[in-house]
Amino acid sequence: MASLDDPGEVREGFLCPLCLKDLQSFYQLQSHYEEEHLEDRDVKGQIKNLVQKARKAKNKLLKREGDDRVEPGTQGYESFSYGGVDPYMWEPQELGAMRSHLSDFKKHRAARIDHYVVEVNKLIIRLEKLTAFDRTNTETSKIRAIEKSVVPWVNDQDVPFCPDCGNKFSIRNRRHHCRLCGSIMCKKCMELIGLPLAHKLTSASKDSLSTHTSPSQSPNSVHGSRRGSISSMSSVSSVLDEKDDDRIRCCTHCKDKLLKREQQMDEKEHTPDIVKLYEKLRLCMEKVDQKAPEYIRMAASLNAGETTYNLEHANDLRVEVQKVYELIDALSKKILTLGLNQDPSPHPNTLRLQRMIRYSATLFVQEKLLGLMSLPTKEQFEELKKKRKQDLEQKRTVERQAALESRRKLEERQSGLASHTANGDVRSLRGIPPPLRKAEGWLPLSEGQGQSEDPDPLLQQIYNITSFIRQAKAAGRTDEVRTLQENLRQLQDEYDQQQTEKAIELSRKQAEEEELQREQLQMLRKRELEREQEQFLAASLQTRTRVLELREVIPFQLEASRGPHIDLSYSLDQDSSPVQSSTAPDILTPGSALAPMHLWSGPPALGQETLPQSTMSQQSDKASLNPFDEDDLSSPTEGAISPAAVEAFLGPPAAVTKEYNPFEEDAEEEEVAELGAGNPFTDPDSPAPNPFDEDDGPRPASPAAPGNPFEECPSTNPFEVDSDSGMEAEEHIEEELLLQQIDNIKAYIFDAKQCGRMDEVEVLTENLRELKCTLAKQKGAPN
């Protein structure tokens, strides 16, 4: 790890990742980190990140290089051999500058292997050409010509010295050419290849070696004969004329390559002695695995007194198995002592392998030999057969007695059925347990005759077996109790499984029903939401249309306001919201007619519809007095605003009492200024006459249409009621109507803001402010 102070310094060892202190071992580093840097919790995350990065880099490096990147020594193994310590918990050493030579190594290795293989193949091919003809019966000149045709020889003048030993060539030190590569060497460096070795290398099997080998052609015999001939010769010419027709001259390098090839062939075809012995050992073990189970079955049957197997055959099989065990022991001992007396002692790994084979064979013999059962003698086998025969007879007797006892109990039960009473109760058999006898069967009594059967057959079976268990316990039949308890457990498990499946099926059906209901509810909500949106859009459009129409009609109908004042209840019926009409049927009272803002109720709320005129006409007492049935222009029609409504929106006449007029502020002054001399109420000093009080003089407006209910006698005029009683009724209803009107106008303001109609927002805001002022004044006025 590089130090922070000196970037060029490289430090190695067990360094602390925080203080860079060099510790001597892994455990010292761990203890130092736990003691000194225990409080540095923030560094833990950084260390984990570094460890993860190093691990990724290591995995990438190992993935790229594979198994070829192996560090020498056993330090890597020892660092992982400590149990309970994870080296990845600590920060590893930083990977220094490195360079992979794997590609170069593979390239050089492939070239070297190719060179070796190609060269060896060339030598074998040339050797095969040199041995393809009969060298003993061919002339020397022809042999020399054939050898030169196989490989070109190097020129003698080009090589003055021997390439191997460096001696100078002369008359005594002649030049010799290698018949396989064509190079030149001296006689000392020359090698000879015998024909047997040549045929062995060129042939596909060793049979060629025995075919071409003879005592006269062996290398030792030939060499010895040549040596004798050389010793017998005294002249130099005889040495120069020496013929080696039965052998092939070659250099040391070619001879070494051919010898390595021969060694590879021998190793490939040779089987070591330990392998042969181990194969025999495995065959013996497999034979024991086949014979031992068969012998165990035979011994168990014979010891039980059965006559299925023959005693003599079992004895023969036992002897055979024992002999195989002895052979296994002998082979394992031979493997253990193999090669111990040889001069070059075997490799320690070979000796260890031999010891483990011996140990494995010993364990095998002990395990199998201890499992062998002894066979009875002939006398013992006869006694066992007699004893088994007696047991079988006794068993048959017991079974016959059990059958007779069960038949007797069945007859008793059938006879006991006749003693039943009228209501079906059993008196003779109930409550009296059967006597317990030795060597007899037992049969439980059914207790479900006087009880209603359960619709579920499993429950009925459980009840019956429970009753049988009680009877078996009372009778002391432990075997039957265990059997019945096992049957009861199985029935209970089956019943529990059945109930679980039913519960799962029921829950699944309920879930499907809930899902269907949820989908239907969502569909209904979606439809309701769409309907509300449509109504909201329609109401918004109607509100905007009415406000715009009102703003356009008000200037043109100001003059018409001086005409006859139609009863305010008409405009109330025309512009009142359906909430007021539906919730208060008696809202058309004299007190409600004087409501100041009832004339401007705005459009209907969301999800509501305006009542048609036919519905409003049905609420009147007399159908003949319905003003909506006539075509008089003075009567207001649907979608038009009456003069009384305009007058009520702009401000009531001056004759109305001041404390009950919510629009007597600036709106009245603006109206007086606009009307001028044509307005009968232009005189501010004179008291404003009340248009609702009857006057003896003629009215300035045109007479009302015949049949108008607003021109009836004073006794039926709702505006001529007693002032005290009218104020009391008006005060309670006005407050409720004003609050409802305030809520409606707030909703209209919200809708106008959402739609971006700021002109309507200003108008509605002014109306809302006036309504609030009126409500405050009415609450503060004395009763």
From Swiss-Prot:
InterPro entries: Rab4/Rab5_effector, Rbsn_Rab-bd, Rbsn_Rab-bd_sf, Znf_C2H2_type, Znf_FYVE, Znf_FYVE-rel, Znf_FYVE_PHD, Znf_RING/FYVE/PHD. Zn(2+) 2 binds at residues 178, 181, 251, 254. PANTHER family: FYVE-FINGER-CONTAINING RAB5 EFFECTOR PROTEIN RABENOSYN-5-RELATED, RABENOSYN-5. The modification Phosphoserine is found at residues 3, 214, 218, 225, 229, 686. The gene is Rbsn. The modification N-acetylalanine is found at residue 2. A zinc finger (FYVE-type) spans 156-259. Residues 263-783 are annotated as: Necessary for interaction with EHD1. This is Rabenosyn-5. It is found in: Cell membrane; Early endosome membrane. Residues 387-399, 405-414 have a biased composition (Basic and acidic residues). Residues 99-262 are annotated as: Necessary for the correct targeting to endosomes. GO terms for cellular component: cytosol; early endosome; early endosome membrane; plasma membrane. Residues 377-412, 471-531 form a coiled coil. Residues 495-514 form the UIM domain. Interacts with EHD1, RAB4A, RAB5A, RAB22A, RAB24 and VPS45. Binds simultaneously to RAB4A and RAB5A in vitro. Interacts with RAB4A and RAB5A that has been activated by GTP binding. Residues 663-673, 721-733 have a biased composition (Acidic residues). One of its GO terms (biological process) is regulation of Golgi organization.
